[in-house]
């Protein structure tokens, strides 16, 4: 990990909020099928209806591409590939229903894993810093603020911190799937339920 020590917090606080939504997709793998849309502001109930009413055999290739295009793969692993800021999703379909999966994507702050949650650090001079606590020693907290760049770790002096609390806001941002149309969303959900396995039954059965 690379540790950055700055006298000011502006740079880190900026990359720790909604500005991440506009991150460039230059890191998306070559050959990725990008969403055609038109997208919408997906809500859980509407998304459930769209997925449940989809017909035909789902596309593994498009589902895998949507996983990359919506930046899921930047934070989550699937079959050993992807980021580490969030939980491994390879077994997601064996543990959660379609509704659970959609809800976790659309309303990420509703349920937050203790392992991947963030901490709010309230500063003595005023203001606060939000980040995932990686480790700490007698002098510093070491935190990651950008889920798309977990190797960027900031050392925050304990002398500057008045108190801390667990954040009620997920590091995962809402709206990541809002560029997808209903077919693209259905393929993404199929890919998640299949755990990235192209031979899964979801790709051989029709509704």
Where are these regions (language model features)?
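Glycine-centered loop/turn positions within well-structured domains
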Residues: 70-73, 139-141, 170
């Amino acid at each position: 990990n690379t540790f950055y020590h700055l006298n000011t917090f502006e740079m880190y606080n900026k990359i720790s909020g909604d500005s991440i939504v506009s991150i460039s997709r230059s890191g998306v793998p070559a050959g990725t099928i990008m969403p055609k849309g038109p997208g919408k502001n997906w809500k859980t109930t509407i998304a459930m209806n769209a997925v449940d009413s989809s017909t035909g055999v789902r596309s593994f290739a498009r589902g895998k591409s949507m996983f990359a295009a919506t930046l899921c793969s930047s934070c989550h692993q699937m079959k050993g590939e992807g980021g580490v800021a969030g939980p491994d999703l390879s077994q997601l379909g064996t543990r959660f229903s379609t509704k659970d999966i959609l809800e976790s994507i659309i309303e990420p702050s509703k349920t937050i894993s203790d392992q991947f949650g963030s901490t709010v650090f309230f500063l003595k001079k005023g203001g606060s810093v939000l980040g995932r606590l990686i480790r700490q020693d007698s002098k510093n907290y070491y935190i990651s603020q950008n889920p798309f760049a977990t190797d960027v770790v900031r050392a925050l002096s304990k002398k500057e911190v008045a108190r801390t609390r667990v954040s009620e806001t997920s590091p995962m941002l809402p709206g990541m799937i809002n560029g997808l149309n209903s077919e693209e969303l259905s393929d993404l959900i199929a890919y998640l339920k299949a755990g990235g396995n192209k031979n899964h039954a979801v790709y051989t059965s029709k509704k």
